[in-house]
């Protein structure tokens, strides 16, 4: 009762601050990720490249990067800007745990997801058993027949993990039907926010806006371990390393290092044009709070 009486005496401004504080506490409580079922046997593990995408990473991946509002925004914009019909057939490159495939499928569209990681494909099948996922390398021209798709999507940094983008763009040109669309997620390497979503509970407000220097680290406390990551951009050779560390409660440690080929927006767009694509549109993802990130829409003539 004393609290209620005291609260009633507060100004409207102070009441708003109290509610915001309680709201932030609730966000932090409910957004603390939970994961079960994995036990690392070795005291120390170091993984690089494709080896990273194993059972643990496929299990934890959604907790680190999944954002349903962003995914909905992207798919809605893609459908609106490219147009779809009964004859539309989608391929989602780097489909991961399957969420973009599921959203497209829910719209009644034919869609296949492809990923190099068998663990990620297995997780996608578990998440969405009615959707189609295959394990394969998109740098292999023979993985699909010519003219198989009307749309190819390459979402959430997938383009940056490819060591031969020229081959990828040439393959997409072959796999697309005439008039088909290639949609690629691209970022401004110098300005996008590398903090993972759980590391920024509010999400709608970027910490970068108020930081004197770019924040490149993320730290998240899980039930079983503490997760940290850091994004290191090398402007000299247009690459970046994404370093991750899992420190388990039992003292065991797992480290990971991923290499990204982080050329500028213009360079990658020109590579697509060199393969014969025409840039038709750009979707700015600031509309879903992903600043300096875009969907470039190319078409095959």
Region locations from a protein language model:
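Conserved class I S-adenosyl-L-methionine
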Residues: 13-16, 20-85, 87-96, 99
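SAM-dependent methyltransferase
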Residues: 184-267
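A short acidic, Gly/Pro-enriched loop at the edge of an enzyme's catalytic core
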Residues: 143-152
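Residues lining the SAM
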Residues: 153-157
């Amino acid at each position: 009762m004393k609290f209620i009486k005291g609260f009633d005496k507060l100004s409207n401004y102070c009441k708003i601050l109290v509610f915001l504080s309680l709201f932030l506490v609730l966000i932090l409580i409910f957004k603390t990720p939970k994961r079960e079922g994995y036990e690392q046997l070795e005291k120390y593990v170091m993984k690089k490249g494709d080896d990273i995408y194993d059972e643990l990473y496929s299990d934890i991946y959604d907790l680190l990067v999944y954002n349903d509002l962003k995914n909905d925004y992207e798919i809605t914009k893609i459908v609106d800007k490219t147009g779809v019909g009964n004859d539309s057939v989608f391929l989602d490159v780097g489909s991961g745990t399957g969420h973009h495939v599921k959203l497209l499928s829910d719209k009644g569209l034919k869609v296949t997801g492809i990923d190099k990681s068998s663990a990620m494909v297995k997780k996608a099948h578990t998440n969405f058993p009615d959707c189609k996922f295959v394990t394969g390398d998109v740098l292999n021209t023979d993985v699909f027949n010519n003219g198989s798709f009307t749309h190819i999507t390459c979402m959430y940094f997938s383009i940056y993990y490819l060591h031969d983008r020229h081959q990828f763009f040439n393959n997409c040109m072959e796999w697309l039907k005439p008039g088909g669309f290639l949609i690629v997620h691209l970022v401004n390497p110098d300005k996008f926010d590398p903090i993972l979503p759980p590391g920024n509970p509010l999400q709608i407000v970027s910490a970068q806006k108020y930081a004197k220097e770019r924040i490149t680290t993320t730290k998240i406390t899980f039930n079983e371990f503490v997760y940290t990551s850091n994004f290191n951009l090398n402007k000299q050779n247009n690459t970046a390393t994404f370093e991750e560390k899992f420190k388990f409660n039992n003292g065991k440690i797992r480290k990971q290092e991923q290499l990204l080929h982080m050329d500028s927006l213009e360079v990658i767009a020109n590579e697509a044009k060199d393969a014969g694509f025409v840039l038709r549109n750009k979707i700015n993802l600031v509309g879903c709070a992903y600043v300096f990130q875009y969907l470039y829409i190319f078409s095959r003539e």
